[in-house]
Amino acid sequence: MSEACFTAADILLPAAGVPLDPWACIAVDQFTSQPEYWQRAEHLADGKPSTLHIVLPEAYLGTPQEAERLESIRRTMEEYRKSVLTRKVHGYVYVERTQMDGTVRQGLVGAVDLDAYDYAKGSKPAIRPSESTVVERIPPRLKVRRGATLETPHVMMLADDADCTLIEPIGLIKNQLPPLYDGELMLGGGHLRGWAVEDPALIAGIDAALAALADPAAFARRWPAAKGQQPMVLAVGDGNHSLATAKAYWEELKPTLSEEQRRTHPARWCLAEVCNVHSSAIEIEPIHRVVFGVGAKELYAALDAWDQQQGSSTTMSDQRLRLADAHGESAVALANPPAPLTVGSVEAFLADFLPAHPGVTVDYIHGESTALALASDPAKPATAILLPDFAKADLFKGVVLGGVLPSKTFSMGHAEEKRYYNECRVIGV
């Protein structure tokens, strides 16, 4: 493999006769407060080849079933390597995902060089997280990565490719490429199609487009205030903690390897899909919060008191949010926000509120309707904190000029539109 930060890979897929439903399953960090979703998925996948059998839904992290599931995952990976993953693509996979609104999201699946990525605060590598990485979330995920012989990605990267040089040219010639899969995804995930990109000339074109995005002079023209900084080529759009876990595992493995092994070991790379942030099919959605164990009236009073304690702002604030529970909804305007984005101010409030209220917990929810539903039971006090829309134009600007955004700031699309596990790659030797 080349030293590019994103490159062609040996990608594995099941035989052509294996249907996407139930082979492909949604990212494990979705529907964490809705175990019934995962029960339905398991029913659909029972006794059939499915990536659900080689991943650990976060709904099961820390449960008595965790150890048994991890053992089952490792056994199933070995079975799939021998008898299920019978097709190999050496190159990229061009994908098209038809979303709930009918738009088609284009992407390229390849391998991220983990030596070109870092989640450490203040680092400026070619590949950067768009949000803060909560390092405490990595160890539970490392349990899955350690000892695994396969990986299957739900990581989605974003390229700042205003001229559409990287992905879109492949889409124009997709009918000339070998088709790989074409079908519906389980539980309302939409339609997914994929084509193999193995022609050396096409791979060279993709690599050249990536090299142009990494050009220091072009980066300095785009971001004059960041002149002299290493160019940022890709930002992590989704799956930040999955990529961070792959990085942590690679750093853990490195000291056990020779210099030659470090250059070629498959765990140095992580499969991911790259999309163009400028695509009209890429929607950046706010991630809402649901606070369990407290009603909206009580939370409103606490938030109002906390806001007043922040001191007097010298400028007019435009930070707005909504609080909702089973009894209704109210609008909130923050007068003295301590952070530049509403989500940052909310996180600062929760950082003070939660330790002072034992038994109150928070979950991060994709989709306003889901957040409202979770806070709608009068018998179980809960409040949905509904955040305003997030402008995707601010994403690269915020990361390049200001560092990472607050954790759980945004999500790319609705929960059902997350990347499904599909392609696989060997990471063990």
Each model region followed by its residue ranges:
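N-terminal extension/subdomain marker
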Residues: 1-190, 194, 198, 221-224, ...
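Short beta-strand segments
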Residues: 158, 236-237, 273, 386-387
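Glycine-rich phosphate-binding "P-loop"
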Residues: 186-209, 334-338
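Active-site beta-strand/loop microenvironment that shapes enzyme catalytic pockets
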Residues: 212-257
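Metal-assisted phosphate- and nucleotidyl-transfer catalytic regions
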Residues: 223, 308-323, 361-364, 377-378, ...
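Catalytic or ion-translocation cores adjacent to nucleophile or general acid/base/metal-coordination motifs
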Residues: 240-302
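C-terminal amphipathic alpha-helical segment
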Residues: 274-342
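Charged substrate- and nucleic-acid-binding regions of tRNA-handling and nucleotidyl-transfer enzymes
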Residues: 344-429
